[in-house]
Amino acid sequence: LPASRPLRADARRNRDALLSAARQAFLDGDADTHVEDIARSAGVAVGTLYRHFETREALIEEVYRKEVDDLCSAPADLLDQHAPDEALRRFLLLLVDHAAVGKGMSLVLESIMATDSPVFGDARNRMAEALGHLLAAGNAAGTLRGDVTGSTLLRALGGICNLRATEGWRDEARQITGLLLDGLRHITPPRA
């Protein structure tokens, strides 16, 4: 759809229903779900799905983009409600929870990883920027180190998310996240 033309209210509702139905199917781990099933679940015709998304891959990309949008909007709200180091802690745990929920989604995303889609690079950049914003706020408040970038922290989180294949990984991921946060805290050396 052209970005310059806003959607009518009914078209917006249909698009949102399609994204919601696709997200749920993908999160349920149904990587092979057919667009017909998604359209039926959304209460629209298959033609409506294809008017909004030219291909199944375009639908997958948009679901993922919306997930990233939701994640990357969280830091501003967290900083409004908490001190920067606590906001960072909560955001790190939110990312771990997202990885847990996104386990089924990762199977679906594999289908677009081989394409030249910029969706993953954009997502990485946006998440690194969100982490960088939290780190900068913590550094300005004197509670977090200033020598770690959002990109570096995102790479560390990537390692944590690779634990998903193991039993009880979430508890271990939360412990490692705590260690990361402890390492990021700005510590004033004791006076001699």
Report residues per predicted region.
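Short linear capping/connector segments at secondary-structure termini
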Residues: 107-117
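Amphipathic alpha-helical segments that line or abut small-molecule/effector binding pockets
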Residues: 20, 69, 85-100, 129, ...
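Basic, helix-initiating cap at the start of DNA-binding domains
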Residues: 1-41, 58-61
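Hydrophobic alpha-helical connector segments
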Residues: 62, 73-101, 116-119
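Amphipathic alpha-helical packing segments from all-alpha helical-bundle domains
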Residues: 69, 115-161, 165-167, 171
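Alpha-helical DNA-contacting segments of helix-turn-helix folds
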Residues: 53, 60-67
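Short hydrophobic/aromatic patch on the recognition helix
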Residues: 43-53
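Conserved NTP phosphate-binding and transfer environment spanning the P-loop NTPase/kinase superfamily
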Residues: 163-168, 174-190
